[in-house]
């Protein structure tokens, strides 16, 4: 989309998503200079759009460009006419041409995106806070958690990014790589929803961070901490925010004994784009020296075919497209491959899933 189209982009966004004005202001002051927006028009009127927000993911220490798909919207008068399909087809074409391994999104309804090859790859742990002080009182009984909390500012963005990459890189197999711009955006985003990013110190050492938003209720969107510190951050947050009903999202932490609702909820769906790039990211049986896959992709025809993967120490050393499948080639779809790689579907012979995943972005 061109700069002169942004008024129409904002109109369609609000018609479809009804965000608080403060959040819409954040998004349209921040993201259009960083992302790509594809749109369809009829008689100069924008009727459908898709936003492609760039991120860098890290898988076992290998960083790669990826795209977070948001803002998929169609004017109510033009729905069920194939406009979203056209935009997704164009998206796949563009991102395949850039050799991006995968794209991902947070679905309003997974059934909308399953026909396009998207499958769940990440579930998020949550604690639902009670309307009264139940959890806050339970945790405050533990006493002083021994941490000091500070509200982060843009001047802290670089330190936050370096710390988060160190924390996540030591514990997660797949996560969103963060830089100064990432935290500039997150600080603006949380502030637009009445929240903030907190930095937790023990003495002079940064040991954890938390990001929350707060309207009528609050939502702790993310807790990051070095091993052993998550419960103490939860104690601090519950003690300071526990008088308001809300939600905490974080790595798993025992909440059953406090009598609060908790569990995992599906959050992110992923889709393979450039298959050969994706295969180079995967984990394989360390004892194997090769694997042959015969792959089917109903939408990206270039991904169809047979591929021989030379394996060394459980990683792909070389990926070769074959003219004909070898004997013993494993027949898979891109959907099966995506789910097996992220441990969300049936296991596939020879492929070891990523176990610890952390993809928490909203936009």
Locations of regions flagged by a protein language model:
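Conserved acetyl-CoA binding element of GNAT-fold acetyltransferases
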Residues: 64-76, 216-227
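Conserved active-site tyrosine of GNAT-family acetyltransferases
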Residues: 113-118
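Active-site/acyl-donor-binding loops of N-acyltransferases
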Residues: 119-138, 224-231, 235-363
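Short amphipathic alpha-helix that is part of the acyltransferase structural core
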Residues: 1-54, 61-68, 135-180, 215-218
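Conserved GNAT acetyl-CoA-binding A-motif
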Residues: 88, 93-107, 242-253
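Amide-forming acyltransferase catalytic core, primarily the GNAT-like/NAT-type
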Residues: 124-239, 251-255, 272-287, 291
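Conserved acetyl-CoA pyrophosphate-binding loop and the N-cap/start of the following alpha-helix
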Residues: 78-90, 228-237
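Conserved beta-hairpin
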Residues: 36-50, 194-213, 353-354
């Amino acid at each position: 989309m061109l700069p002169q189209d942004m008024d129409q982009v904002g109109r369609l966004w609000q018609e479809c998503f009804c965000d608080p004005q403060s959040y819409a202001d954040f998004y349209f002051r921040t993201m259009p200079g960083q992302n790509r927006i594809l749109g369809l028009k009829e008689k100069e009127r924008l009727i459908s759009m898709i936003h492609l927000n760039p991120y860098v993911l890290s898988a076992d220490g290998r960083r790669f460009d990826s795209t977070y798909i948001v803002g998929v919207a169609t004017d109510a008068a033009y729905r069920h006419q194939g406009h979203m399909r056209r935009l997704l087809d164009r998206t796949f074409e563009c991102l395949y041409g850039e050799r991006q391994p995968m794209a991902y999104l947070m679905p309003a309804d997974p059934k909308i995106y399953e026909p396009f090859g998207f499958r769940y790859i990440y579930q998020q742990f949550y604690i639902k806070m009670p309307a009264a002080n139940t959890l806050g009182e339970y945790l405050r009984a533990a006493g002083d958690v021994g941490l000091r909390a500070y509200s982060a500012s843009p001047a802290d963005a670089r330190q936050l990014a370096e710390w988060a990459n160190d924390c996540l890189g030591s514990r997660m197999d797949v996560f969103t790589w963060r830089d100064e711009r990432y935290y500039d955006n997150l600080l603006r985003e949380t502030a637009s929803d009445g929240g903030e990013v907190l930095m937790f110190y023990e003495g002079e050492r940064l040991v954890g961070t938390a990001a929350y938003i707060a309207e009528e209720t609050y939502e702790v969107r993310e807790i990051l901490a070095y091993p052993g510190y998550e419960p103490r951050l939860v104690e601090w947050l519950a003690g300071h925010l526990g008088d308001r009903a809300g939600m905490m999202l974080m790595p798993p932490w025992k909440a059953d004994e406090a009598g609060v609702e908790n569990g995992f909820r599906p959050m992110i769906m992923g889709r393979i784009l450039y298959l050969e790039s994706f295969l180079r990211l995967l984990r394989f049986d360390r004892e194997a020296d090769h694997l042959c896959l015969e792959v089917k992709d109903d939408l990206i025809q270039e991904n169809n075919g047979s591929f021989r993967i030379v394996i060394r120490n459980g990683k792909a050393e070389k990926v070769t497209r074959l003219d004909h499948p070898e004997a013993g080639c494993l027949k898979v779809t891109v959907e099966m491959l995506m789910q097996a790689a992220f441990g969300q579907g049936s296991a596939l012979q020879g492929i070891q899933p990523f176990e610890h995943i952390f993809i928490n972005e909203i936009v």
